[in-house]
Amino acid sequence: KLAEQILITVNELLTAKGLLLKAGTVVDATLIAAPTSTKNKDRARDPEMHSSKKGNQWYFGMKAHIGADAESGLVHTVRGTCGHVSDIAEGNTLLHGDETVAFGDAGYQGIEKRADATPDVTWHVAMRPGKRKALNKDNEADAMIDKAEKLKASVRAKVEHPFRVIKRQFGFAKVRYRGLKKNTAQLVTLFALSNLWMVRGKLMEAQG
């Protein structure tokens, strides 16, 4: 629970400074690779990691699911699962409860109809790529839909930033431990640090 407390404490600080708003949430998930080698003391792959297909490629590892502030891109919720758990299965668990709107890519289609959906939250989920491609831009109605999709995409883009920070700034490209618990704790801590890194300039300005 220490990692979760670190994230909570960091976000309380950022909220107090007006850097973390809570009107909207963007959800997303990314696969994190785990060693596939069985050359270890157990002579087996980590049983808590699983294979998952992304596009035409298979990955073995875990999945990091995050809920981030739609305004700033700062992360408020982190969940770690096996790699084969679908994005939509965790989507509603990534909401903090105070938001009125939420955004997600096409992998979250139908999330508002799930049993764990929150009725007070309006979801803005991306169209399936094929469906958007079929839009006729010369048609006024289709052009408006495409414009709305671009606006949704601009909001969703903010959730990519924290993933980029933990991978590029902190070098987190693959799991470091066996089991979900330790790796999830590390992820939570890294996202807390990424929040500070993302607003480091504003925090330094505030120090005067």
Predicted regions: what they are:
Residues 100-101, 106-181, 185:
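Helix-centered, glycine/charged polyanion-binding patches within enzymatic domains
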Residues 1-119, 128, 188-194, 200-202, ...:
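Polybasic low-complexity intrinsically disordered regions
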Residues 167, 171, 197, 201-204:
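Hydrophobic alpha-helix feature that most strongly marks membrane-spanning transmembrane helices
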